[in-house]
Swiss-Prot record:
Name recorded for this polypeptide: Large ribosomal subunit protein bL17
Gene this protein is translated from: rplQ
GO cellular component: cytosolic large ribosomal subunit
Claim: Secreted is one of the keywords in the record: no
UniProt keyword terms in alphabetical order: Ribonucleoprotein, Ribosomal protein
SUPFAM superfamilies (alphabetical): Prokaryotic ribosomal protein L17 (SSF64263)
Pfam families named among the record's database cross-references: Ribosomal_L17
Ribonucleoprotein recorded as keyword: yes
Top-rank taxon, per record: Bacteria
Length: 112
C-alpha cells in the first residue's frame, strides 16, 4: 500500500485533500485527524517549495491544486517569501487529543 485511502473513492479523497490544503493556506492552521494531517503536510510542503520559485509556471502549477485564486495569491505573496531561507519543514503537527465520537486522534496542523 503506497498511500492512505481513507475509505474514500479516488475523486472524493483528492477533493478532501485539496480542500484541506486550501484551508491550511487560507487559515494558516487546521484541526483534523492525524493520518489526514500527515498527507496534507506532504502536499503543502511541496506546494510551498514550488511557490518559492515565484515564476508563472509555478503559479499555474499551484492553481491546478488549490481551489481559490486568492489563496494562491497569499501563498506566493506572503507565505513563500516567509520561508525563503528555510529548506523544508514549513509545517508542524501538534496532537490535541481524541475526538469524542469515535476516539480518532485529532491534531493541529499549522504553518511554522
Amino acid at each position: 500500500m503506497g498511500y492512505r485511502r481513507f475509505g474514500l473513492t479516488t475523486g472524493h479523497r483528492k477533493a478532501m485533500l485539496r480542500n484541506l490544503v486550501t484551508s491550511l493556506f487560507r487559515d494558516e492552521r487546521i484541526e483534523t485527524t492525524g493520518p489526514r494531517a500527515k498527507d496534507v503536510r506532504s502536499i503543502a510542503e511541496k506546494l510551498v517549495t514550488v511557490a518559492k520559485k515565484g515564476d508563472l509556471a509555478a503559479r499555474r502549477q499551484c492553481l491546478e491544486y488549490i481551489y481559490e485564486e486568492d489563496v494562491v495569491r497569499k501563498l506566493f505573496d506572503t507565505i513563500a517569501p516567509q520561508y525563503a531561507e528555510r529548506q523544508g519543514g514549513y509545517t508542524r503537527i501538534i496532537k490535541v487529543g481524541y475526538r469524542r465520537g469515535d476516539a480518532a486522534e485529532m491534531v493541529l496542523l499549522e504553518l511554522v
